[in-house]
Amino acid sequence: MQKLKQQVFEANMELPRYGLVTFTWGNVSAIDRERGLVVIKPSGVAYETMKADDMVVVDMSGNVVEGEYRPSSDTATHLELYRRYPSLGGIVHTHSTHATAWAQAGLAIPALGTTHADYFFGDIPCTRGLSEEEVQGEYELNTGKVIIETLGDAEPLHTPGIVVYQHGPFAWGKDAHDAVHNAVVMEEVAKMAWIARSINPQLNHIDSFLMNKHFMRKHGPNAYYGQK
């Protein structure tokens, strides 16, 4: 697990590097599907002092199997998503400014241009709010459940992120670094959408044919973006 702990540590350290977190906010995890174990950031440990060996290993029930610290308080959310979507290899949660603003506004981040379409096939959805019962109960688990309720059976890697109403963004990917990459892009397109709608409140969504072209040339069966 040492290699995966190193990867998760490096991915967590990318969050302050890209300006996605303040203080100890945010967390990244990754899963070893063969072993049924998840590596995740410890709760409340400062990025400035954090080391790879500080990463916490939990099983799919959330029991700590390796590590000196308590795992992230959002661990149950991560585990619920891993259980539901086998294609996920890494998950990240932040409170990045612009994506969180859309979450607080209770609005999906609209697909307005090709930057968005290169990564997200359609709007980045916003969940419903959690009920008082859901918050007072197993809050973090129910956060995962409301994300799943919103995504349904859609392939999560086609829209690798979501904003949780009144909370903030979650993103995911094939591994921890891919999840952080998508979180960075989500923050950027959230900012772009806010600026674009401020300039033109009547702005329409990107044309579907243009969105399809940009997404499929990077992610479709006949993708040709980049090098083989």
From Swiss-Prot:
Its cofactor is Zn(2+). It comes from the Bacteria. The active site is at D118 (proton donor/acceptor), Y225 (proton donor/acceptor). This is L-ribulose-5-phosphate 4-epimerase UlaF. Binds 1 zinc ion per subunit. Gene3D superfamilies: Class II aldolase/adducin N-terminal domain. It catalyses: L-ribulose 5-phosphate = D-xylulose 5-phosphate. Coiled coil: none annotated. Keywords: Carbohydrate metabolism, Isomerase, Metal-binding, Zinc. The gene is ulaF. The keyword Metal-binding applies. GO terms for molecular function: aldehyde-lyase activity; L-ribulose-phosphate 4-epimerase activity; zinc ion binding. Zn(2+) binds at D74, H93, H95, H167. One of its GO terms (cellular component) is cytosol. Belongs to the aldolase class II family. AraD/FucA subfamily. Its EC number is 5.1.3.4.
